[in-house]
Amino acid sequence: IAIEGPIGVGKTTLANKIAETFNYDAFLEQPAENPFLKNFYKNPSQSALATQLFFLFQRMQQIEDLKQRSLFENVRVADFLIEKDRLFAEVTLSNEEMVLYEKVYEHITLDAPTPDLVIYLQAPIEILKARIVKRGNINEQYLTLDYLERLNDAYSRFFLDYKSAPLLIINAADINLESNESDYEALITMIMSNPCLLYTSPSPRDLGK
C-alpha cells in the first residue's frame, strides 16, 4: 500500500496507523537524512538541485532494499510513490536544473514494485499550512503558500491520469486521522469493503454517517 499527497496532508501518520492496525511493516521516507533539506527550506533556489538528487538516490536505494527482501515477507505500507521524485523536481527546480536532473534520472533504474493500492490524500493549501505549523517542524515553517499551491496542483495533475494501480482519493481536509478514531475507522472500512476501487473520491466522514 502506498500513501501519497502533498506536504502536511498526513501521509506518514496514516501509513504508521495502518501498519500498526494490521501488523504491517511501515516503509517510510527518511527526510531527516537529507543534509541539504534544511537549507532548501530557507533558500530553495540555492539548494534545490542537491536536495532533489539526494532524495532521488535515497529513494533508489530504498527501492533496491525492498526488492532484495523476500516476496513472502510482511505487507508494507509506504508513505511515498517513487514517481513523486520527478513530481517534486518539476515543482522545485529551475529549467536548467531540470535538464541536469533528467540526464541523471534517465541513467537510473527505478523498477519499483507496483502497489496493490494507492491512497491519495487531498487537502487545500490553507489546511496543509495549518497542519505544518501545528506539527512544529521549524524548517518546514519556511514553506510558502505559493510553493504548497504549486505542489498541490502538481499532485492533482499527476493523479488525474494515474492508472498504474488501484487508486483511492480521500478528501483529508475535514478529517483527523491522527486523533479521531472514528475518522480512521471509517477510512479502514472503506478500504476493506472496496479493495479494488479505482478513482474513488468519497469522504470518510460521510461514510461514517
Short names for language-model regions:
Residues 199-204:
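Conserved small/polar residues in nucleotide/adenosyl-binding loops
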Residues 11:
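Conserved lysine of the Walker
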Residues 20-57:
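Conserved substrate/cofactor phosphate-moiety recognition/catalytic segment
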Residues 85-156:
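A glycine- and Lys/Arg-enriched "phosphate-lid" helix/loop adjacent to the NTP-binding pocket
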Residues 3:
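Hydrophobic anchor at the beta1->P-loop junction of P-loop NTPases
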Residues 6:
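P-loop (Walker A) phosphate-binding loop of NTP-binding proteins
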Residues 51-112:
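Glycine-rich phosphate-binding loop used to anchor ATP phosphates in small-molecule kinases
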